[in-house]
Amino acid sequence: MFLAQEIIRKKRNAEALSKEEIQFFVKGITDNSVSEGQIAALGMAVYFNDMTMDERIALTTAMRDSGTVLNWDSLGLNGPVIDKHSTGGVGDVISLMLGPMAAACGGYVPMISGRGLGHTGGTLDKFDAIPGYQTEPSSELFRKVVKEAGVAIIGQTGDLVPADKRFYSIRDNTATVESISLITASILSKKLAAGLDALAMDVKVGSGAFMPTYEASLELARSITAVANGAGTKTTALLTDMNQVLASCAGNALEVKEAVDFLTGKYRNPRLYEVTMGLCAEMLVLGGLAANDADARTKLNTVLDNGRAAEIFGKMVSGLGGPADFVESYDKYLPKASIIRPVYAERDGFAYSMVTRELGLAVVTLGGGRRKPGDALDYSVGLSNVCALGQPINKDTPLAVIHAQSEAAFEEAARAVRGAITVSDKQPEKTPEIYQYVRAEDL
């Protein structure tokens, strides 16, 4: 028998907790036998004294097992269950293409996603822009769509990882969100509860990233790779660039349009293509669907070019209640803003740098993101045709096109865009889309 206060005392004194102590405490978080004050105290003790990798693995698996863990064995799937998770960014629409692409190559992708908060957009909010699409289907429908389409992107159900819900809300209120140990357990407990064989992790770096520095992003990537593999799920983390908007746009309906255009080959933003391919190829290799990165990329290009990935996206949308002809006719279903107008720079030159976070917040200001959980969204608003770094800027090439519902909102967003993008006489150095891979064998 353990006492919560003795577990807190041990961690306060910078001692390592045993697997059994961690399991006891997580059970207490779940069944409310541990108080909010005790959870806050342990969170603060971990924040200051950290956890070993063994402690992180124990915390992650205990939180994963605090609710339902999905099991796909009964469906008789003829391929691996694989997924991707991103720490979040601006214009990060990768999931919408990557899920169908991986499914078209023989994987099964049960992607449980979140809503946006602050400057980062949420994958679920993008799907809410599609009329009829159920982001919270019954577990029977979720399993049916995963089996038949190969991919289903839905929201977290109430019976998955209840320990994380309670722990996270307390961390949020007590300034202990920024602990790498706790971030690792929070992210992975949710992902691993989906019953995955393999996971590719997208850890963002730069001015639109969740972690403040490259070093912090790298530390998180290493922690996630070590803990996920330690918990039995093959995982690689990629450090990818978020020093500019990833897609050409930011905003829910706008990003859905860009994702469909990417899948059908109408338009593929080169940066978005590179990061999507890197993550998706890693999923195929980890899942045993491709021999190596080059083999995986060949397979992925094939399913993009022959239309199979686009077809699977359509199958997922209709399977979850959306329009059957969405891929062909998205224009008649996606909402449009009443004001669609470019914003220009005050001088000519090159797009030199971008405070990506501020562009994400401009979308929030327009009504396309949340200031607090539960806020209603306007799916039509946002930014499109966002300039790329290094691009020439003059009176004919705008910084971006703003989609707004009022003149006042347009003006406020225009000020934010001008303030977030620096135009200079010199061109910036080109940065890679993918900085590095963190694989299990590298640790």
From Swiss-Prot:
UniProt-listed Gene3D superfamilies: Nucleoside phosphorylase/phosphoribosyltransferase catalytic domain, Pyrimidine nucleoside phosphorylase-like, C-terminal domain, Transferase, Pyrimidine Nucleoside Phosphorylase, Chain C
EC number: 2.4.2.4
UniProt GO MF annotations: 1,4-alpha-oligoglucan phosphorylase activity; thymidine phosphorylase activity
Glycosyltransferase keyword on record: yes
Highest taxon of the lineage: Bacteria
Catalytic reactions on record: thymidine + phosphate = 2-deoxy-alpha-D-ribose 1-phosphate + thymine
This protein's pathway: Pyrimidine metabolism; dTMP biosynthesis via salvage pathway; dTMP from thymine: step 1/2
GO BP annotation list: pyrimidine nucleobase metabolic process; thymidine metabolic process
Xref: InterPro entries: Glycosyl_Trfase_fam3, Glycosyl_Trfase_fam3_N_dom, Glycosyl_Trfase_fam3_N_dom_sf, Nuc_phospho_transferase, PYNP-like_C_sf, PYNP_C, Pyrmidine_PPas_bac/euk, Pyrmidine_PPase_CS
GO cellular-component term (any): cytosol
Alphabetized UniProt keyword annotations: Glycosyltransferase, Transferase
Family: Belongs to the thymidine/pyrimidine-nucleoside phosphorylase family.
Function in brief: The enzymes which catalyze the reversible phosphorolysis of pyrimidine nucleosides are involved in the degradation of these compounds and in their utilization as carbon and energy sources, or in the rescue of pyrimidine bases for nucleotide synthesis.
Protein name per its UniProtKB record: Thymidine phosphorylase
Organism, scientific name: Shewanella amazonensis (strain ATCC BAA-1098 / SB2B)
